[in-house]
């Protein structure tokens, strides 16, 4: 299976870049095929998804790029191919896909910046090629090993350097001479490279003695102090390598002999030191330093450094003094420094490749002081140095910003303290250097035990203030709290704020056995029956508690799918390509003919949307949608809807703002800026939605999907667009992400954010996916959320180039959509995911499951199939018919009284349920109490055409006098009830889900309870009849040809789930299935041959007395004087009310205490500055 990991050289995923790929490619010529040169090429190929460049690289050696850091291993296998950084096939592959051409055994002879051309020695593969024109030239020529040219005998036979494969091969050939066996081999230089060379001489196994000569008092003098060096010295000597310290070579003494051609030849005989001592030897390897290879640039007139090791002078962008010529790696001199470690060279390559490919989407990166931390195993000794490891000797080079500001303010001097640990028995030495207050780690060194290296280096890089004493770092003591232990919430934690249900309230009935299912728990405690936002946590507590009691907890979607979770159903629907609820019920349901319920319907609708992306109002899917999706707007407290056009990344033009203002003013809509940086218009009547959206769509706006379990917004700060601190183009990236994922539906809502720097103004760290710009790209954080149980995001990937952001997020979102449970946010999903973030990284970044290509392709298919739902609805007459308050009249009726608040109209407050908020009258008993009933025609039966084939049937809201009624046709049967849900006295039952309990066996329409016999005369005129008992009803004289009548109570009788808080009412008995205190009135209903639907109703005035809208609608004053009345009174008494533009003043503690006393202190909790006054 093809590896689609992002470590591959290229990605086929679309880039957010708007640039065209038809422009001619620019040529980049790279001089030098070493580790830094190939690092640049790899990064450029990876980032250049638009294929803007062709690359030509030349290398002097006959080998492709190999690992110079691992040169010592060459002596064990002597196969250079084992050191190759990429196999030869890699070069062939990218010749085809990325226009990479490489020439080996080819030297750069001269450079002409004026003509932008490079003269080269003819490559063996292309002898006619002598000149390479370039658009950009990258000099990665590296360095050469220093030889002491002033030392006599430095050029004798037997003198080597330790730099490349050719040096090692020469050393191997030399050591095969029989004269060498048993002799002494010498390494001059006790640094990193010198100790590596010493190991190489040992591995040759021909020298009787290997000696290292170091002019300082200890080895590794550039990495460790004297005490640490002495410990290394002890370890090296223990392995059989002799070390002479404080020795300087005066002369290499030679034997002068003649070869077969009688040509004089000098051969190493020994070393004379400056102190007069002599050491006989046959072989010398100099490892005394390096010199930058800058001759090509120097001869071309490009500025080079004159001191130190030379080097081609570069600026922070790594450009030389010549236009379009750059230098990276050991040949580059940055701020007077050259770097002989691979790390800084790779960082240079990274910066340059990023700027060539990503700078048009992001702030160009600059090269900064590199991290010179090293961790090596030299001759069996573990050695590491990190950060400012000589800060105690030379003074600190850099201080944490916070400390630097404090010292600047106080005029103090930077002081450091070193903490040292030495264990002579285990040969362990550690020295960590801290600021004088012990709050910051600046650097350190480790010998013998380097296990803490990975943990400590980030503390230095990030300047993180320590939360443990320095001694705990150096001793490796366990930080208090490292053991996470039990992360369960305390028992008194409030889980459901709507009904003030604590964790203990949920656990107790489960442990007592009173509740054995999630539905029982909701009915018993009322948790999750309010806003529903606590349900993920309620479910989690239920599952944990039941598991602790030894009860098996099945993660099935609902009773209709007892064997399958949402993820299971996703796979079944995907593989079998199911597209309707009946199809799914037949394939996976407990009852093939079931209508489903309020749990499985929206979950299956979400799966359909994630797979097939059909319109939510299409006939097959409309009945599966919750009320918000059903009318493409969030239903509000009073039954009206909110209107939220998309404002990608919060960026909006003045023209669109004006249109929004005009629409809000025309339809008297309450307006508010949302937390997602867009404008919400509240109070839109269902019958006005089409007209409102027509104006918005005509102005170039589209649905913001604020109503859907889908991508909501991608919030952004202004980033580099305006902010002087901006590092990345957060607005541009957020716009691209929101435009890409708009309309994407999932198990729950999805929110994103992009911040332009670490100040994090967009709060990307608590989003389902968030980006924070860094100098190298973006850090990608995932699986955070606010809500009932807030959770900070976790880091998925660091420093991701902009072109790789989208493939990663594509994979993450699709994997979440495929595997999450119903109504499970990404935070809870990750918590429940086996293996957690480490496993997710393997799946998303390393393609552990081999599905990354599939995830990207599926996301692209959804992106390509996007359409604006509101624009489609405006062009579909059938959809438009659904936007009516009443099916039998164009009249409107307000569902709740309104009041003016801060200049805008809003619905009055709901009273508390225990103070009249719920209508707990015996509505179901009205069937026995009507003085008389007559069959009344209410609506043409054609309105319900096609209902029998739909998962929710077809419903209608009917106005009769002042009373609102609801009528359904479901699987050939009619049902009627009051429109009002008594829980909150809202008028919306006709817009709810219809559900049935699953039968033990498959049901058909014939298995439903039979219709009552027909006795009333078939007539359009009212016919009176006496009241009937709940178990008997007046029957019509003749039934319609469809035999379609009221369905009495039975095992498969349907219920209606209120769209507000999911109270479920039987459409036959009127009883509430999940709240025994509530009920609704139901009515007999039938279709007759005259094409009308009839409901058996009492007289209008009697109907209105019991069910009239004016009687039950929530009115002003019912909720009391308001939650903030006391606060308003306080402000009024302080003279604050109504003032604008005032300067803040803080009341004195004594004055506040006199006026409001203890009550104010309890309400506010005191001020953050120590006073009890209010702080806003």
Curated annotation (Swiss-Prot):
Its EC number is 1.7.1.4. One of its GO terms (biological process) is nitrate assimilation. FAD binds at residues 26-60. Its cofactor is siroheme; [4Fe-4S] cluster; FAD; [2Fe-2S] cluster. Residues 1-23, 998-1051, 1124-1157 are annotated as: Disordered. Belongs to the nitrite and sulfite reductase 4Fe-4S domain family. This is Nitrite reductase [NAD(P)H]. It comes from Neurospora crassa (strain ATCC 24698 / 74-OR23-1A / CBS 708.71 / DSM 1257 / FGSC 987).
């Amino acid at each position: 299976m093809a590896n689609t990991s992002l470590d591959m050289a290229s990605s086929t995923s679309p880039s957010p870049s708007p640039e065209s790929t038809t422009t001619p490619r620019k040529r980049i010529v790279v001089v030098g095929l070493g580790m830094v040169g190939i690092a640049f090429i790899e990064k450029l190929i990876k980032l250049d998804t638009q294929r803007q460049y062709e690359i030509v690289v030349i290398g002097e050696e006959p080998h492709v790029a190999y690992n110079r850091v691992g040169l010592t291993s060459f002596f064990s296998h002597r196969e250079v191919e084992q050191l190759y950084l990429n196999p030869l096939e890699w070069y062939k592959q990218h010749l085809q896909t990325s226009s990479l051409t490489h020439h080996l055994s080819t030297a750069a002879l001269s450079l002409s910046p004026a003509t932008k051309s490079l003269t080269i020695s003819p490559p063996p593969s292309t002898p006619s090629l002598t000149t390479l024109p370039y658009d950009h030239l990258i000099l990665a020529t590296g360095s050469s090993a220093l030889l002491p040219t002033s030392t006599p005998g430095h050029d004798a036979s037997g003198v080597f350097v330790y730099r490349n494969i050719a040096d090692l091969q020469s050393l191997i050939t030399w050591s095969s001479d029989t004269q060498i066996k048993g002799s002494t081999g010498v390494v001059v230089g006790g640094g990193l490279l010198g100790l590596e060379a010493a190991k190489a001489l040992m591995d040759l196994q021909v020298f009787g003695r290997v000696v290292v000569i170091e002019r300082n008092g200890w080895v590794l003098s550039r990495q460790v102090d004297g005490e640490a060096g002495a410990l290394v010295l002890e370890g090296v000597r223990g392995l059989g390598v002799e070390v002479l310290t404080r020795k300087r070579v005066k002369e290499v003494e030679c034997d002068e002999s003649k070869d077969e051609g009688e040509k004089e030849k000098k051969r190493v005989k020994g070393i004379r030191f400056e102190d007069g001592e002599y050491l006989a030897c046959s072989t010398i390897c100099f490892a005394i330093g390096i010199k930058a290879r800058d001759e090509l640039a120097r001869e071309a007139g490009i500025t080079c450094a004159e001191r130190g090791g030379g080097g081609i002078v570069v600026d922070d962008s790594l450009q030389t003094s010549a236009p379009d010529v750059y230098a990276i790696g050991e040949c580059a001199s940055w701020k007077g420094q050259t770097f002989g470690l691979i790390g800084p060279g790779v960082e240079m390559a990274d910066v340059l490749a990023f700027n060539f490919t990503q700078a048009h989407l992001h702030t160009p990166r600059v090269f900064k002081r590199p991290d010179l931390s090293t961790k090596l195993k030299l001759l069996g000794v573990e050695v590491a140095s990190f950060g400012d490891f000589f800060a105690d000797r030379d003074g600190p080079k850099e201080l944490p910003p916070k400390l630097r500001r404090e010292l600047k303010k106080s005029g103090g001097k930077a002081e450091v303290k070193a903490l040292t640990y030495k264990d002579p028995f285990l040969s362990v030495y550690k020295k960590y250097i801290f600021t004088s207050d012990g709050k910051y780690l600046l650097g350190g060194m480790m010998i013998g035990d380097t296990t803490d290296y990975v943990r400590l280096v980030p503390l230095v890089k990030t300047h993180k203030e320590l939360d443990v004493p320095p001694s705990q770092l150096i001793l490796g003591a366990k930080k208090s709290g490292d053991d996470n232990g039990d992360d369960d919430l305390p028992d008194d934690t409030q889980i459901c704020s709507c009904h003030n249900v604590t964790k203990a309230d949920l656990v107790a009935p489960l442990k007592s056995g009173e509740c054995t299912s999630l539905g029982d728990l909701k009915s018993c405690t009322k948790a999750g029956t309010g806003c529903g936002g606590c349900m993920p946590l309620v479910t989690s507590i239920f599952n944990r508690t039941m598991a602790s009691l030894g009860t098996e907890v099945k993660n099935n979607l609902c009773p209709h799918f007892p064997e399958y979770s949402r993820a299971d159903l996703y796979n079944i629907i995907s593989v079998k390509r199911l597209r309707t609820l009946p199809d799914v019920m037949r394939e996976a349901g407990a009852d093939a003919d079931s209508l489903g319920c309020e749990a499985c319907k929206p979950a299956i609708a979400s799966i359909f949307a994630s797979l097939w992306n059909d319109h939510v109002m299409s006939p097959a899917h409309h009945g599966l949608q919750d009320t918000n999706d059903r009318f493409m707007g969030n239903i509000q407290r009073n039954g009206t809807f909110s209107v939220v056009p998309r404002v990608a990344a919060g960026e909006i033009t003045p023209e669109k703002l004006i249109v929004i203002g005009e629409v809000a003013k025309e339809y008297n809509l309450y307006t508010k800026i949302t937390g997602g940086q867009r404008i919400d218009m509240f109070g839109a009547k269902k019958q006005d939605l089409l007209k409102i959206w027509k104006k918005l769509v005509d102005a170039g706006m589209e649905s913001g999907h604020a109503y859907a379990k889908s991508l909501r917004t991608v919030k952004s700060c202004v980033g580099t667009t305006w902010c002087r601190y901006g590092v990345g183009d957060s607005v541009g990236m957020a716009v691209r992400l929101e435009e890409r994922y708009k309309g994407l539906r999932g198990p729950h809502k999805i929110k994103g954010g992009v911040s332009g720097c670490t100040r994090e103004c967009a709060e990307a760290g608590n989003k389902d996916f968030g980006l924070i710009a860094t100098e190298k790209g973006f850090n990608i954080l995932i699986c955070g959320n606010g809500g009932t149980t807030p959770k900070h995001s976790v880091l998925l990937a660091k420093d991701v180039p902009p072109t790789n952001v989208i493939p990663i997020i594509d994979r993450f979102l699709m994997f979440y959509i495929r595997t999450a449970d119903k109504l499970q946010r990404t935070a809870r999903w990750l918590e429940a995911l086996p293996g957690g973030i480490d496993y997710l990284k393997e799946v998303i970044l390393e393609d552990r499951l081999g599905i990354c290509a599939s995830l990207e392709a599926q996301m692209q298919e959804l992106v390509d199939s996007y359409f604006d739902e509101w624009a489609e609805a405006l062009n579909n007459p059938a959809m438009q018919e659904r936007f009516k308050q009443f099916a039998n009249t164009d009249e409107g009726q307000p569902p709740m009284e309104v009041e003016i608040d801060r200049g805008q109209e809003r619905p009055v407050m709901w009273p508390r349920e225990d103070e009249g908020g719920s209508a707990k009258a015996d509505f179901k008993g009205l069937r026995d109490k009507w003085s008389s009933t007559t069959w009344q025609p209410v609506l043409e039966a054609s309105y319900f055409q096609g209902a029998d084939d739909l998962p929710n049937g077809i419903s209608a809201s009917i106005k009769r006098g002042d009373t609102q009624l609801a009528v359904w046709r479901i699987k050939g049967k009619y049902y009627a009830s009051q429109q009002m849900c008594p829980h909150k006295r809202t008028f919306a039952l006709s817009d709810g889900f219809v559900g049935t309990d699953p039968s033990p066996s498959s049901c058909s329409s014939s298995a439903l309870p039979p219709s009552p016999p027909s006795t009333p005369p078939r007539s359009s005129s009212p016919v009176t009849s006496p009241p009937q008992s709940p178990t008997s009803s007046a029957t019509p004289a003749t039934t319609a040809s469809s035999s379609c009548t009221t369905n009495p109570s039975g095992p498969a009788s349907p219920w209606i789930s209120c769209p507000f808080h999911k109270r479920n009412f039987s459409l036959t008995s009127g009883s509430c299935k999940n709240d025994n205190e509530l009920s609704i009135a139901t009515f007999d209903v039938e279709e007759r041959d005259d094409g009308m639907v009839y409901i058996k109703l009492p007289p209008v005035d009697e109907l209105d007395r019991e069910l009239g809208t004016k009687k039950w609608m929530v009115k002003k004053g019912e909720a009391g004087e308001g939650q903030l009345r006391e606060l308003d009174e306080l402000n009024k008494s302080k003279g604050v009310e109504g003032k604008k533009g005032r300067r803040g003043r803080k009341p004195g503690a004594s004055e506040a205490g006199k006026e409001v006393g203890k009550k104010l202190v309890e309400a506010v909790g005191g001020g953050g500055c120590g006073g009890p006054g209010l702080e806003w």
